[in-house]
Amino acid sequence: MEFLIFSDSHGSASNMSLALDRQIKTPDAILFLGDGARDIDNLFVVDTPIWAVRGNCDWASSDYADKTERLLYFEGHTILLCHGHEWGVKGGLGALIAHAAEVGADIVLFGHTHVPTLTTIAAGETVGKTVLSRPMYLFNPGSIGYEGSFGVLTFKGENVLLSHGKL
C-alpha cells in the first residue's frame, strides 16, 4: 500500500498534479496535511481516496478538509494526520509527540514548517506516561507549493517506508 503525501500547497494545485503524474504507479490514496485544502478540489484523480486536514491558512475548508486532525488505520498502524500549528511544531516536536502517544499513533504526518523532516523514536522509549511498543515515525513532506517537495508512505509487509520527493 502506498500513499502520496502533500502539505502546504498554498494555491499550487499544479505542483500536486505534477508530482502525481511523476509517480510510477497511481498511489492507493492521497494524504493532504493542510494549507491549501481548496487546491485538492482542483486535483483530478479517479478512484483514488483523498484524506485531508485543515491548516492555519485554510479559512474556508474544502469538502475533503473538514477537520484539523484525523486518525487513519492501515496495515495495523495508526496514522495521525495534522497540520502541526496546533502543536507548535515550528518551536519543536515535543507537544506533537506527546499528543501522538496519547492517541496511540505510531505514524505522525504533519506540515506547517515547510521543512522536509523524518524523525524516528525507538520502540521502548517513554513518551509522557506511554512506553512505545513500536517505533513512532514523525514525517513532514515539506511544502509542495513553495519548494516542490512531497512525501511517500509505503507499507511493505511489516516495514514502514517514508521518503521525500522533489519536483
What kind of region is each of these model predictions?
Residues 17-18, 75, 98-103, 125-167:
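Binuclear metal-dependent phosphoesterase catalytic core
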Residues 10-15, 37-41, 57-62, 87-91, ...:
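Active-site environment of divalent metal-dependent phosphoester hydrolases
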Residues 1-50, 62-67, 148-149, 157-158, ...:
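N-terminal active-site segment of His-dependent metallophosphoesterases
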Residues 2, 49-51, 78, 137, ...:
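Conserved beta-strand segments of alpha/beta enzyme cores
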Residues 49-90:
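Helix-adjacent hinge/juxtasegments
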Residues 67-71, 115-116, 128, 150:
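Short, acidic/polar N-cap/turn motifs at the starts of alpha helices
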Residues 5-7, 29-35, 51-56, 80-83, ...:
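Active-site neighborhood of phospho(di)ester-bond hydrolases with catalytic His/Asp-centered motifs
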Residues 15-22, 81-83, 87-100:
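Pre-active-site segment of Zn-dependent metallo-hydrolases
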